[in-house]
Amino acid sequence: KVDGLSVALEYRDGVFYQGATRGDGRKGEDVTGNLRTIRSIPMVLPEKLPRLIVRGEVYMARSVFEEINEELELEGKPLLANPRNAAAGSLRQKDPKMCARRRLDIAVFNLQLAEGRTFTTHAETLAYLKAQGFPTISHATLSKGEDILCEIDRLGDTRMDFPFDIDGAVVKLN
């Protein structure tokens, strides 16, 4: 699981319409303007569904975090605490230009709504999201409990190989 800030992205007729943080679970903060500055978020999708909602995690890559902190240190300004807080704070900036300078990224992990489309498995939804241009993270489809535990251990052992911080593993039924 990418360690960042969860957001929902809504598309209407294949065009990015609105984005919000998770907030209290029912109502989040509208951060559409700042989300538009994230280059990895597609603004127009190949398939023009009437309405599509996806969920993803906005994050700051460790390399970007380190570069920004080096710049802040040279300027004598306070350093950012960690990539997760830096991403969350950047996404909540009032000025989209400031957010753009923070070079945030996103990993989309769930399809919430796809009007006019049906899917049988979670793996199918991830393949669809990737085909629509959304960045997704690697995943495995496993059927045995012992294989799942081995994969979780592998993720723990290789966590520093990812360009972003992770705060665990997610196991979903397909």
Language model features: what each stretch is:
Residues 1-174:
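RNA/tRNA-interacting regions in translation and RNA-turnover enzymes
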